[in-house]
Amino acid sequence: MASSSSFTYYCPPSSSPVWSEPLYSLRPEHARERLQDDSVETVTSIEQAKVEEKIQEVFSSYKFNHLVPRLVLQREKHFHYLKRGLRQLTDAYECLDASRPWLCYWILHSLELLDEPIPQIVATDVCQFLELCQSPDGGFGGGPGQYPHLAPTYAAVNALCIIGTEEAYNVINREKLLQYLYSLKQPDGSFLMHVGGEVDVRSAYCAASVASLTNIITPDLFEGTAEWIARCQNWEGGIGGVPGMEAHGGYTFCGLAALVILKKERSLNLKSLLQWVTSRQMRFEGGFQGRCNKLVDGCYSFWQAGLLPLLHRALHAQGDPALSMSHWMFHQQALQEYILMCCQCPAGGLLDKPGKSRDFYHTCYCLSGLSIAQHFGSGAMLHDVVMGVPENVLQPTHPVYNIGPDKVIQATTHFLQKPVPGFEECEDAVTSDPATD
């Protein structure tokens, strides 16, 4: 098994250093970072200018209303928003009926980042609900009785690992899950998202993530997968959904994280990838865009910034002498300022950018990115930078799985005590024809 425990992370110290210098985004000269279109307007430049104007309004309002600007994470408001979401959703969420394990994961992970305990009765209810989402054929669907799909399977396994109880672990049918993964495996090393569905890098990551957490990796399950992911890296340096496609932050994270799990990071051109992802941080806003010439979006606070710890580790293993020993290779302060000033809904929850509505997806990934930006390294290299008040500090998140590092260790330790299901039987079960049995 490609053990995740080799990727060591830490729990934050009782008190983390607080950044005391003037806010980066409120410097008088910061306006010079805005887009210069050289008097040649395009649809892209017009949309970018609109976003920058909204961001500037937020920065100016913050500067006007705070004689001594101090950033505050509205923890209590976010907690109450998340707590309500676990029990009751409005009809606006009907469109996510096929994403219900995702809602469980987004909310539970947000709560663990805020260091809010999950009541036992809630944990049990989540376990029982996710068990209803599990298919008799293996994997999890987007809701009870729905077809299994790798995306909700990833979300369900992560949610159960966050709960981290024997009850939660026992929900996962590992034998059937392995059979399901084999049914999705393609000859070129890629995976379908679901039976009869599409292939892209997300599926390789989801498969590698759940297989490594639950200890069901077999000798041939990921044969050819690293090579297929490497073919998805394009001339830009990032990774597209499939070979030949445009580089995208979500796909790039999935590709690199899958290769970290498989211990095949060197399959990629890491320097080219580093240049691409660091170029995605917006100079004026401080947040990240998902693709070249796209707008800033709070969710990429994780999908893009989460790549930097993975790249740091991979380049460090190669002995790169240019690596910082105290900071990730992006502007951690600017990202924290964007999230805390521009992405918090006054009523709780976080959002894409000013003018957008809050939702649990953006709450999860904005908080995850904020955690990445606050915490650097481990052990002797531990260095935290927390913008604003000391209470803003979040729990760390594991950049491969995006759950707590302690929950990764706990889950892998638990499942390593169990044997890998007999993969020969799994292959036979997948290839057999029920009509002739």
Swiss-Prot record:
EC code: 2.5.1.58
Q: What is this protein called?
A: Protein farnesyltransferase subunit beta
Site, as annotated: Important for selectivity against geranylgeranyl diphosphate: W102
The species is Rattus norvegicus (Rat)
Instruction: Spell out which residues are annotated as carrying Phosphoserine.
Output: S432
Cofactor names from the entry are: Zn(2+)
Q: Which PANTHER family match?
A: GERANYLGERANYL TRANSFERASE TYPE BETA SUBUNIT, PROTEIN FARNESYLTRANSFERASE SUBUNIT BETA
Q: How is the cofactor bound?
A: Binds 1 zinc ion per subunit.
Q: Does the keyword Mitochondrion apply?
A: no
Job description of the protein: Essential subunit of the farnesyltransferase complex. Catalyzes the transfer of a farnesyl moiety from farnesyl diphosphate to a cysteine at the fourth position from the C-terminus of several proteins having the C-terminal sequence Cys-aliphatic-aliphatic-X.
Q: Name one GO biological process term.
A: positive regulation of cell cycle
Any GO molecular function: acetyltransferase activator activity
A cellular component term from Gene Ontology for this protein is: microtubule associated complex
Q: Where are the PFTB repeats?
A: 123-164, 174-215, 222-263, 270-312, 332-374
Oligomeric state and interaction partners are given as: Heterodimer of FNTA and FNTB.
At which positions is Zn(2+) bound?
D297, C299, H362
Reactions catalysed, semicolon-separated, are: L-cysteinyl-[protein] + (2E,6E)-farnesyl diphosphate = S-(2E,6E)-farnesyl-L-cysteinyl-[protein] + diphosphate
User: Which residues does this entry mark as bearing Phosphothreonine?
Assistant: T436
Q: Where does (2E,6E)-farnesyl diphosphate bind?
A: H248, G249, G250, Y251, R291, C292, N293, K294, Y300, S301, F302, W303
Q: Which UniProt keywords apply?
A: Lipid metabolism, Metal-binding, Phosphoprotein, Prenyltransferase, Repeat, Transferase, Zinc
Q: Which family does it belong to?
A: Belongs to the protein prenyltransferase subunit beta family.
